[in-house]
Amino acid sequence: MSTKRKNTGGKKNRAKSRKVEYDDEDISSEHNSEVDDAEAGSNADGEDAAEDALTDVSDMPELPAPEGGWGKPGTLLMCGLTNWEMAGRKAPPKGIKANVGRSLWTPHTFKNLNNARVRLIASGPAASHSIIITEDNRCLVFGKNDKGQLGVGDSKRRDEPTEVEALKGHTVIGASCGRNHTLFLTSRGIVFAAGDNKLGQCGVGKSDACIVTATKVKYSGPPIVKVGCGAEFSMILDIKGGLYSFGCPEYGALGHNTDGKYFITNTKMAFHYEKVPKRIVLYVERTKDGHVTPLDRVEITDFSCGHYHTVAIDSKSRAFSWGFGGVGRLGHNEQRDELVPRLIKFLEPPSRGVRAVHCGSTYSIAINVHGFALMFGQTKRTGEANMYPKPIQDLSGWEIRCVGCSQTSVVVAADDSVIAWGASPTFGELGFGEMRKSSTTPMEVKALEGLYITAVTCGLSHTLMICRDDTEEERAKINKLQVYSV
């Protein structure tokens, strides 16, 4: 990789197969909210209260749009695996053809959009489906849909972008994809969910196994400004800095000081999961000798979810992490799981404060207030892991604009270039081409040289990007790229 520096300057701990049953009943009072519903903005005790959630949103005010609006429109580019059922698998599931969809080894334009410009893209490191929002506010979805995660009313796979009818009339300003579920955020601060709900990850207050039509999450607190999905849990952030979680609590992923396990019998274990959003009320600092101090007045401003962990930033540029601690992905120089958000001492302000965080499946990337990227966890399937945040030296001197994190791959838009890396096996999500499919060190994506990427998101084995197309010169370069059509 060409350097652009300033002159002054083990193996994933896989979760064992869970031989547990998921109980629909709320049987333990220890999981009740530590604050009342008015403060938490949640209906923590179940479906009856959830029914009181707002249904008519027409009178709700719009959230203030950022300068420039809800995302700058551009041309959608895509690379990676398009056989969605094969993502993360060596063999196709029973009844699924192995050759439906191919790998796009370099970035392609998407013919089926019919030249529609796109202002928002979303996927997730565990997801084999994607969300795209067009300039004229259509919410389009495509990819795997076996649990109804596309929200289109059925469970049929979509290769061609399909509009979500349930969201017509809404302006979608944010979205996130879990393994088999999806969250949509509208401009009025309302959250809709679809997909697998076996563990409550859709937050609709019901125990339905699948939610095939986009349905409003049972929440009635302050407007929501951001949504995020782990593999089997969800996070939403309100306008006042309150963070709420729901879904599977395994490894402490929900941040409620529990992993949700309980015994039904001497040999039978189950999980208590959260079916509606519940506020995270405790943030702590732990010293080297194990002393724990609660922190007051924490207002979260941003967050990112990995498969089973979350990293969040507060208004003081402090970073907190919790959930599964394997291979150092939480940045605390140890592998213990954290059941509540814990301050990352290695990223403490003022000299080391954080302005952005991005989580992959088993790793995290923080961009500090000086613009340097630091990684903790493990992007490779083997080898040494970063137990605490360490600078990514190959990105030193680049002005990082946006980051996409996949299972083991990372794609970064910086200055007028795109930089990517990821260990084998890869399926084209890095965009290097068929001759060199992977790289364990950051490399520039030559196919995008001279193009300005404004947004990046990564799925399990694919990457979406929005490319600026304001000038004739930029459009001419885009037209030279290969075209993907279904």
Predicted regions: what they are:
Residues S2-V486:
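Eukaryote-biased RCC1-like beta-propeller repeat architecture
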